[in-house]
C-alpha cells in the first residue's frame, strides 16, 4: 500500500472518516502473486454479502463503454510478422514489446464517484484515484488510451530524431546476434489478403491491454522502440518523479533481449522459422502438473480437473491438434461439474434459498435473490470435494500427453504462422457424403471416391431404426460422421500430394481449405466433439495425421446446391436404385478425365471404418501410408 500511495494511485485517509462517506461499499481486496512478476492488488467489485446488497459492478454497465478489441491483437501481430517476411525475405525480423506501468490507474475517477471505490486496510481508508483491477469498466476505459498509443506510435515511427532522445534507454537493450550465412529464413508469400509492408519506414503496433507488441527489421527496430516510448509519454505524461510515476515499464528494455525469438503473451514466436510454440518453461510446467496425474492416481476433484483442462486449452492455442487428445478428460470434468452442481443444490441452505426464491417469483426482489443464489451455487460448486474417478480411457490420454510433452523432438510442438493467420489457401478441396458412399476432389488436380462397406451401410439411418433414447442409437453411423470421414480423406490426399510434389506450393507450410456442406463436420475440424464417441475416435485419427504434418487444415461451409460435383461423385454406388455412373459423370464433367485419382490406403480406411463401427480409440498410431495417386488417368 505504501507503493500505491507513493505512485499516487490512491488517497490514504484515517479509517474513522468512513462514517462520513455516503457511498462506501464492502469491497474485499486481494493480492495476486506470480513468480517473476510484480504483485498486483485486486479490487473485488462483484462481492455482495447478501442478496439485498448492491456491489459497485452492479451499478456499472459496459454497454456504454468503448468496445474491447484486444482479443484480436495476437492475430494481427502474427499478420504483421507475415507481411514483414513477404517484404524482407532474407532479413532478420526482430520482436519486441513494452508495457504501461499501472495501466488502469491512468484513467482517473471523477471526485464525485471515487469514494464509492474506497476500501479499508488496517487503520487506513484508501480512495482509489484511478481505475481498479476488478471493476468491469476498467478494461473498456483503457481501450481509448491503448488505441491512441498504437496510432500515434505508428505516425511517429518514421522519425529518426527520436532515437537520440531515448538513447539512454534503448542503448541498454540487448539485441540477439545477427544471422550468419547458414541461417535459413522460412518464406511467406503474397496473396489477396497480405501484400507485404506498404511503408517500410513505419512500424505497426498492436496493443494487448497494456502490452504493445511490434516486429521490425534490425536496422529499424531502435527507431520503433523510440516511437513507442514517445507515443506513451505524449499520452500519459513525460517522466517527472516528483509528480507521478514513469508510465513506461523499463523492465522489458533492461531485462529482456530483442530477438528473432521471443515469448509474447505466453507463446514463443520465431520469425526465422515463422512459427509459434509452447514455451519451454510452460512445457516443463505442464509436465510437472501432469506428473501428479500418475497411473496410480484414482480420482480428482472438479477444481483439479478444471485447472488441468485450462492448461491443456492454453497448449492448444499453439498446437490446434491438442484439442483432440483429451476427449475423455473433458467429458469426465463435465460429468463432475454436473455432479457437483447437483450436490451443491441438495444442501439444506441452498434448498431453503431456492424455496424462498420460488415463493417470491414475480416480485422485484426476485431478480436480486436469483442472481445472488446462482453466484453462490457457482462458487460453492467449484469448492465441492466430491471425487470423480479416472477411467482407463482417461488414463491413456494422460499417458499420451505426458509422452508427447516429454519428447518435443519426436512430436513437433511448433505450428507455422501460415496455418494460423487468415490468408488465401494453397490447396482447395470439396467433399460430400451420402449414406452409401463419399467422394471429393481438388479442381484440376485429383478426385477420389469410396463406397462405404456394407457393415457401415447397415448402421446408417437408412437401415437402422432408432430413437434418441434407444440403446441402438449409439451404433448409428450418422451423416455427420460420414461427412467428417470425407474431410479426413481430403486432408490425407493433399498430404500425399504435397509430399510427392513440394514444388506445388511456394512455401514450406501450405494450407488446405476444405469446403463441406455439413456444419457439424466443419466444426469438428477445430472443435472437439462432445457427445459422439465415434466422432471422438475419428478426431483422434485426424490428430495422428496432423502431428508433424507441414500441411495445415481449415474448413468452411458451402451450400449443398453449390457443392454439385462432390455431391455427384458421392452418389455413385453399386445399387439398382442408383441413377449415377462414372460414365455419366465424365460426360457431364469432361475435365475430370485429365485429373488423377487418389486411392486412400487400406490401412487408413481400416482405421476410419473401425472408428465408425466401434468408436474405439486407436491411440496415436498414424497410418504408415495414407494412399497413392493413380497416374493412369481414366482408370476406375
Describe the residue ranges of each PLM region.
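C-terminal functional segments of enzyme domains
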Residues: 263, 268-272, 550-604
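A short, polar/acidic, helix/strand-boundary loop motif
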Residues: 123-148, 183-188, 445-485, 520-529, ...
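C-terminal reverse transcriptase regions that engage the nucleic-acid substrate
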Residues: 127, 258-418
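Polymerase palm active-site segment centered on the conserved acidic dipeptide of motif C
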Residues: 68-75, 97, 161-176, 185-200, ...
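Flexible, glycine/threonine-enriched loop-and-boundary segments that flank and lead into catalytic domains
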Residues: 16-18, 182-196, 402-435
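Inter-domain linker/hinge segments that demarcate the starts of reverse transcriptase
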Residues: 1-20, 74-83, 144-158, 221-242, ...
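Catalytic-core region of right-hand nucleic acid polymerases
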Residues: 5-157, 269, 277, 281-328, ...
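RNase H catalytic domain
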Residues: 206, 492-564
Amino acid at each position: 500500500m505504501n507503493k500505491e500511495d507513493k505512485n499516487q494511485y490512491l488517497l490514504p485517509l484515517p479509517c474513522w472518516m468512513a462514517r462520513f462517506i455516503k457511498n462506501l461499499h464492502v469491497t474485499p481486496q486481494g493480492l495476486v502473486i506470480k513468480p517473476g512478476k510484480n504483485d498486483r492488488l485486486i479490487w473485488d467489485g462483484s462481492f455482495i454479502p447478501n442478496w439485498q446488497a448492491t456491489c459497485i459492478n452492479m451499478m456499472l454497465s459496459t454497454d456504454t463503454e468503448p468496445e474491447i478489441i484486444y482479443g484480436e491483437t495476437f492475430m494481427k501481430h502474427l499478420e504483421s510478422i507475415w507481411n514483414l517476411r513477404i517484404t524482407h525475405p532474407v532479413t532478420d525480423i526482430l520482436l519486441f514489446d513494452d508495457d504501461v506501468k499501472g495501466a488502469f490507474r491512468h484513467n482517473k475517477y471523477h471526485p464525485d464517484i471515487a469514494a464509492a471505490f474506497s476500501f479499508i486496510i488496517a487503520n487506513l481508508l484508501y480512495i482509489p484515484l484511478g481505475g481498479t483491477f476488478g471493476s468491469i469498466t476498467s478494461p473498456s476505459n483503457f481501450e481509448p488510451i491503448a488505441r491512441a498509443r498504437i496510432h500515434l506510435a505508428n505516425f511517429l515511427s518514421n522519425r529518426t530524431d527520436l532515437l537520440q532522445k531515448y538513447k539512454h534507454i534503448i542503448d541498454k537493450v540487448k539485441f540477439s546476434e545477427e544471422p550468419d550465412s547458414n541461417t535459413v529464413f522460412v518464406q511467406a508469400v503474397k496473396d489477396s489478403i497480405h501484400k507485404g509492408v506498404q511503408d517500410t519506414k513505419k512500424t505497426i503496433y498492436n496493443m494487448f491491454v497494456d502490452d504493445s507488441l511490434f516486429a521490425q527489421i534490425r536496422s529499424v527496430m531502435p527507431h520503433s522502440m523510440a516511437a513507442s516510448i514517445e507515443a506513451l509519454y505524449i499520452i500519459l505524461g513525460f517522466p517527472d518523479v516528483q509528480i507521478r510515476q514513469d508510465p513506461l515499464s523499463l523492465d522489458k528494455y533492461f531485462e529482456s533481449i530483442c530477438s528473432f525469438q521471443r515469448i509474447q503473451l505466453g507463446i514463443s514466436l520465431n520469425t526465422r522459422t515463422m512459427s509459434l510454440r509452447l514455451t519451454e518453461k510452460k512445457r516443463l510446467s505442464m509436465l510437472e502438473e501432469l506428473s501428479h496425474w500418475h497411473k496410480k492416481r484414482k480420482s480428482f476433484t472438479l477444481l483439479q480437473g478444471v485447472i488441468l483442462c485450462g492448461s491443456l486449452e492454453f497448449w492448444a492455442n499453439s498446437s490446434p491438434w491438442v484439442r483432440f487428445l483429451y476427449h475423455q478428460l473433458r467429458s469426465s470434468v463435465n460429468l463432475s461439474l454436473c455432479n457437483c452442481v447437483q450436490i451443491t443444490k441438495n444442501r439444506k441452505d441452498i434448498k431453503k434459498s431456492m424455496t424462498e426464491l420460488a415463493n417470491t417469483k414475480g416480485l422485484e426482489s426476485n431478480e436480486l435473490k436469483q442472481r445472488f443464489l446462482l453466484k453462490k451455487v457457482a462458487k460453492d460448486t467449484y469448492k465441492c470435494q466430491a471425487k470423480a474417478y479416472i477411467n482407463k480411457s482417461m488414463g491413456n490420454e494422460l499417458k499420451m500427453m505426458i509422452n508427447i510433452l516429454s519428447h518435443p523432438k519426436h512430436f513437433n510442438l511448433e505450428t507455422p504462422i501460415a496455418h494460423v493467420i487468415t490468408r488465401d489457401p494453397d490447396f482447395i478441396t470439396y467433399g460430400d457424403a451420402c449414406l452409401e458412399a463419399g467422394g471429393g476432389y481438388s479442381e484440376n488436380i485429383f478426385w477420389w471416391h469410396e463406397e462405404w462397406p456394407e457393415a457401415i451401410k447397415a448402421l446408417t439411418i437408412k437401415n437402422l431404426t432408432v430413437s434418441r433414447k434407444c440403446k441402438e442409437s449409439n451404433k448409428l453411423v450418422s451423416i455427420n460422421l460420414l461427412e467428417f470421414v470425407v474431410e479426413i480423406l481430403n486432408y490425407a490426399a493433399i498430404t500425399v500430394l504435397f509430399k510427392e510434389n513440394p514444388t506445388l506450393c511456394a512455401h514450406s507450410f501450405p494450407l488446405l481449405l476444405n469446403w463441406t456442406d455439413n456444419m457439424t463436420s466443419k466444426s469438428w475440424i477445430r472443435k472437439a466433439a462432445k457427445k459422439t464417441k465415434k466422432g471422438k475416435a475419428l478426431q483422434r485419427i485426424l490428430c495422428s495425421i496432423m502431428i508433424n504434418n507441414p500441411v495445415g487444415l481449415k474448413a468452411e461451409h458451402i451450400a449443398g446446391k453449390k457443392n454439385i460435383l462432390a455431391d455427384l461423385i458421392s452418389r455413385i454406388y453399386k445399387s439398382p436404385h442408383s441413377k449415377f455412373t462414372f460414365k455419366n459423370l465424365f460426360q457431364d464433367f469432361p475435365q475430370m478425365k485429365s485429373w488423377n485419382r487418389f486411392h486412400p490406403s487400406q490401412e487408413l480406411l481400416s482405421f476410419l471404418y473401425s472408428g465408425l463401427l466401434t468408436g474405439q480409440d486407436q491411440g496415436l498410431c498414424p497410418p504408415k501410408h495414407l494412399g497413392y495417386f493413380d497416374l493412369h488417368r481414366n482408370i476406375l
